[in-house]
Amino acid sequence: FLSVAGAIMMVLALNFGGFAAILTALFIIGLGFSLQQTAAQPFAIALGDPATGSHRVNLAGGVNSFGTMIGPIIYTLALFGSTKVTDAQIASLKLDSITILYSCVGGLFFIAALLFIFSKKLPAGTSESSVEKSNKATRVLIIMTLLIFGFFTPAFMSYIGVDKMNNEQSQYLSQLHDAYSANTTSVGNRQNVLFGKVFENYNTDKTLLTDNSKSALDSLIIYDASGQEKLNSSIKSIAVSFNDLNKTIKHDLEVYRLKWLFAALAVIVISLFYANARAKKSSAGWGAMRYSQLVLGMLGIFTYVGVEVTIASNLGTLLAQPEFGNMPAATIAPFISVYWGSLMIGRWAGAIPVFNPSKSMKNFLLALVPLFGFGVIIGVNTIANNNMSPLYWYVICVLVQIAGFFISQEKPATMLFVFAAFGIIAMVVGLFTTGIVSTYAFLSGGLFCSIMWPCIFALSIAGLGKYTTQGSAFLIMMILGGSIIPPIQGKLADVIGIHQSYIVAVVCFAYLAFFAWAVRGILKKQGLDFDAQLEGGH
C-alpha cells in the first residue's frame, strides 16, 4: 500500500506539483519497494520446508529479474506505442503519458495487496520466536545511519550551490553578450559568430567565471573594425581558457564529493568492526554482532547489492563512449535487458532444487536452464524489435556460468568464491579491453552476481542460533550498499573516466571472494561444516 500511495502522489505531483514533489513521490515508491524486498525473503522461506527456503528465494528472485528484464520493453510500449524510439521522442515525451503509466503501476500494486490480504492459503508470515535485545548494537547502527546522512549532505548540497552560481554566471554572460552586440559595427555579424563559439565551448555546469576571465571579456566590448584580428585571437584564447577552467573546477568539485562518499563508506566499515570487537569483549547488549561471520556477511550483502546495481547504473554511460560505439540511448535497451536477464538466468538455475529432481535430472537441468533462460532473453527482445545480433555470442559467458555451477556443486562457500573469482576476471577483462569484448565482460557481472545473495545469507547466519532472526534483519539492512557504491563509481567516473571507474566492481568482487575464503575458517572454529551442513542453504 505504501507503493500505491507513492504512485498516487506521483500522479498528483506530475499534474499539480513541482520537482520536489516528484522526488518525494519517488522516495515513497522506493521505500515501498525496499519494504517489499525486506518482507519477501522470510515470506518465501515460510511458504514451505525451511531446508529448501533459499531455493524458493532464488525462484522469486528469478521472477523478479524476469520482470526487470521485460519492464523496459513494456513501459516503452506503454509510453510510445512502439519498442523502437529515438532520442528525440524521449526528449519530447509528454507528462500525460507518464501519468497514465504511474496510474497503472498504482493499480497493479493495489491488486497485489488485495490478493495477499484475502488469500486464505498463504502463511501468516509472523515468527513466534522472540528477537533478542541488542541495545548497544542498535545504538551503533543509529549513529552510523546519522553519520551517513551527515556525510552525504555536503555532497548533495554542492549541487545546489553550483546551480545557483550557474544562474548568476548565465545572467552575466547574457548581459555581456548583449553589450557586445550593441557595440558591434559592420563586422558585427562575424564577431557575433565568433563570440557565440565562446558560449558553445563553455560548459555552464561549473562555477562562476574568474575575475580575470570577466576582465578579459569586458575588454572585448569596446573595439573598432581595425582590431578585428586581435579580437578574433582574443575570443579563441578565452574560449580555450574557459574549457581549461571548466575541467579544473569540475575535477576539484567531483574530488570533493568523492571524499564525502568515501567518508560515508568508511563510517559503515568502522562501525561494524567496532561493534564486533566490543561484542567479543562483552556480549551483553550486542546481540548477533558478536559473530564475525555475520559482520563480514553484512559487508558482503552491502558489497553484493552495490556491485549488482552499479554495473547496470553506469552501463548506459559506458556504452555511449566512442570506444564502445557511441551508442545512442535508444539502442542501449537490449544490453541493459541482457544484464538483468543474466541475473534471471542464474536464479532460475539456483531454484532447480525446489522441484526435487533426481541427481541426473538436476545436472541436466543445470546445463539446460541457463541456456533456456538466455533463449528467453533473446526471444523477448527480438519480439520487441530489438537488434540482438551483437549479443548472440554472449552465450559463451552463459557456458562459463554453467561450468561454475558444476565446479561449486551447490556448496555455498565454494560457490561464492568461484563466482566472485569469475566476477574479478570478467571486470579486469572489461577494464583492459574495449568494444564488444569489454561489453560482454561487464554484462557477465550479472551472471556471476545472480546466485550470491542466498550464499552470503546462508553463510552469515550459520551458527547464530537464537540470534538468527536478528542477524537476518541486520543483513537485510545492508542493501543500502545499492545507494552508496553506485554514487561512488559515478563520482569516480567524473574524475578518472567511466571505463576506468569499473575498478569499483573489481574491488567489490574481491571482497566477496575474501568473505568466501574467510568465513570458512570462522565457521570451522565454531565446529560448523560450512559446506556439508549448509548445502541446503544455497
Question: What function would you assign to each model-found segment?
Answer:
Residues 71-72, 76-80, 147-203, 210, ...:
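Extracytoplasmic gate region of multi-pass secondary transporters
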Residues 35-49, 312-315, 450-465:
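Intracellular juxtamembrane helix-capping segments at the cytosolic ends
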Residues 52-83, 472-485:
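Glycine-rich segments within core transmembrane alpha-helices of 12-TM secondary carriers
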Residues 112-121, 382, 405-409, 506-538:
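Multi-pass alpha-helical transporter architecture, strongest
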Residues 250-260, 295, 324-339, 363-368, ...:
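Loop-to-transmembrane helix entry
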Residues 19-36, 393-401, 437-452:
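Hydrophobic core of transmembrane alpha-helices in multi-pass small-molecule transporters
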Residues 2-16, 374-388, 404-409, 422-434:
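C-terminal ends and interior cores of transmembrane alpha-helices
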Residues 71, 75-84, 103-130, 140-163, ...:
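C-terminal membrane-cytosol helix-exit motif in multi-pass small-molecule transporters
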